[in-house]
């Protein structure tokens, strides 16, 4: 992928952009192999990768500059603001909309938040795109309520030009800290969620719910998990750190009870809608801490198969101990951090690694997703 911003040293996020995808994936595979070198792996599956441009479905833009000349992008290593509306990680239609949003901010006259002076109103613009319909969820992160009227004044014109914008909200983040969003979310549209679909599973996105940023690879990851779980013929499933339900809903059926646990109530609300849409009745999605949930269950509640998809910190020693004690016949672990994955695998007792597969969800970076299946020795 070519990038003028990288060539000019304005944005260095895609640090491996000059390497081919095959070289990038080979390097990531080597890292993963080294991190898991202390474990016996029965099957190494071929890495999965896809498009290296036009794939990303979410933009997190810092709003810089001034009200009369706003810039959506980042601050360069030398301290200059630069627009990233034409970043090639985004689909072309998304790039065009980002340029239009710069114009929107200018027309609305909203002063960008100046971190050094702690003045201004508009901190971030967050844009999420649904791959299934090309529809959008648009969020304005403001310091206060002062500029909401300005957004509402210009919004009808924007929505008439871009009817594919289905959800618009304002998030209030009042503190002078490096925090992306605050607690208060104000919807400016009747719709409050974005429709998406991976494979044959309907999924829904709300402003604060986590969602994978590379839809093509995420779909393959979910499908692989579905196939691996199907081989196990489970009688019951847990999906911990379930988010909007992507893994569990791919693996569940009308005859297999599924328990999904996620700390975000917004994500759980989306997961419940998906389950209802799919006609799944033996499903229980609950907003709880996954570690606390597992610790509060007794042996009679233990699942046949457990899926975990934790944040970068991993599942931690307590949950590793709970899983070891429950001793399900298999554990599927999807990780975005191979370092914490290796640490957790060492703390889960009584299993061997049957399968490992790398999914390159983050081209041009050092990051990747990995799916591991742990089974009890026969």
From Swiss-Prot:
The record's keywords, sorted A to Z, are:
4Fe-4S, Iron, Iron-sulfur, Metal-binding, Methyltransferase, rRNA processing, S-adenosyl-L-methionine, Transferase
Binding-site residues, S-adenosyl-L-methionine: 212, 241, 262, 309
In terms of superkingdom, the source organism counts as Bacteria
Cite the GO molecular-function annotations of the record.
4 iron, 4 sulfur cluster binding; iron ion binding; rRNA (uridine-C5-)-methyltransferase activity
GO annotation, biological process: rRNA base methylation
Q: Which residues bind [4Fe-4S] cluster?
A: 3, 11, 14, 87
**What does UniProt list as catalytic?**
336
Identify the EC number(s): 2.1.1.189
Query: Catalyzes what?
Result: uridine(747) in 23S rRNA + S-adenosyl-L-methionine = 5-methyluridine(747) in 23S rRNA + S-adenosyl-L-homocysteine + H(+)
Is Nucleotidyltransferase tagged as a keyword?
no
| Recorded family membership | Belongs to the class I-like SAM-binding methyltransferase superfamily. RNA M5U methyltransferase family. RlmC subfamily.
Summarizing the function annotation, the protein's role is: Catalyzes the formation of 5-methyl-uridine at position 747 (m5U747) in 23S rRNA.
Q: What is this protein called?
A: 23S rRNA (uracil(747)-C(5))-methyltransferase RlmC
Source organism per entry reads Shewanella pealeana (strain ATCC 700345 / ANG-SQ1)
User: What taxonomic ancestry is recorded?
Assistant: Bacteria, Pseudomonadati, Pseudomonadota, Gammaproteobacteria, Alteromonadales
